[in-house]
């Protein structure tokens, strides 16, 4: 090929495309949407809840009498104080109408909120219902490392449809 053939080819090409308009871009470029801060926080909460709470773990809990549990190394006097209602719960979680998966997330969020707000005691109302949450909530609480103890709540805080939970808030001075 020489330069004359090249110029002639370009001239023919220019003559052919004369008057043609370029096509406007109508294709969509799909990009994965960026996750919002709320979605990231929700996913993180689910991950924490799933890592702490297992549905297959069966701890040794009392069959008769009030529902109660005390972590190793915690003074039994703390359980007695919970039973008598000496601790006033700062936070209250009502699980009425929740599914198990939702209840797990809410329970994990409650424990995180207690630690963040330096609340040593909280109340979890699981209700009566079909008894599923009433059975599962104590089993989940036993598995969480921040839970020191729990006891069936006094009548004023829900009776046998609720639990008072004692949370380990770290080295901060204890409040009642």
From Swiss-Prot:
UniProt-listed GO biological process terms: rescue of stalled ribosome
Listed GO MF terms: RNA endonuclease activity; rRNA binding
InterPro entries with a match to the protein in the record: Smr_dom (IPR002625), Smr_dom_sf (IPR036063), SmrB-like (IPR022990)
Entry's EC annotation: 3.1.-.-
Origin superkingdom: Bacteria
Domain Smr: 93-168
Keywords attached to this entry: Endonuclease, Hydrolase, Nuclease, RNA-binding, rRNA-binding
Function: Acts as a ribosome collision sensor. Detects stalled/collided disomes (pairs of ribosomes where the leading ribosome is stalled and a second ribosome has collided with it) and endonucleolytically cleaves mRNA at the 5' boundary of the stalled ribosome. Stalled/collided disomes form a new interface (primarily via the 30S subunits) that binds SmrB. Cleaved mRNA becomes available for tmRNA ligation, leading to ribosomal subunit dissociation and rescue of stalled ribosomes.
Protein family: Belongs to the SmrB family.
The protein's assembly and partners: Associates with collided ribosomes, but not with correctly translating polysomes.
The protein, known as: Ribosome rescue factor SmrB
Record lineage: Bacteria, Pseudomonadati, Pseudomonadota, Gammaproteobacteria, Alteromonadales
């Amino acid at each position: 090929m020489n330069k004359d053939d090249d110029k002639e080819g370009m001239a023919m090409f220019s003559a052919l495309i004369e008057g043609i308009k370029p096509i406007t871009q109508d294709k969509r470029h799909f990009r994965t949407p960026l996750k919002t801060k709320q979605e990231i926080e929700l996913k993180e909460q689910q991950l924490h809840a799933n890592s702490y709470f297992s549905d297959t773990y069966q701890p040794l809990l009392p069959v008769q009498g009030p529902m109660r549990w005390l972590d190793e190394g915690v003074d039994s006097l703390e359980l007695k104080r919970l039973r008598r209602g000496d601790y006033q719960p700062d936070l209250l979680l009502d699980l009425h109408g929740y599914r198990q998966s939702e209840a797990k997330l809410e329970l994990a969020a409650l424990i995180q909120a207690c630690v963040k707000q330096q609340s040593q005691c909280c109340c979890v109302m699981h209700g009566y219902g079909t008894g599923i949450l009433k059975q599962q909530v104590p089993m989940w609480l036993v598995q969480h490392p921040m839970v020191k103890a729990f006891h069936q709540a006094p009548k004023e805080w829900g009776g046998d449809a609720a639990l008072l939970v004692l949370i380990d808030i770290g080295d901060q001075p204890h409040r009642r």
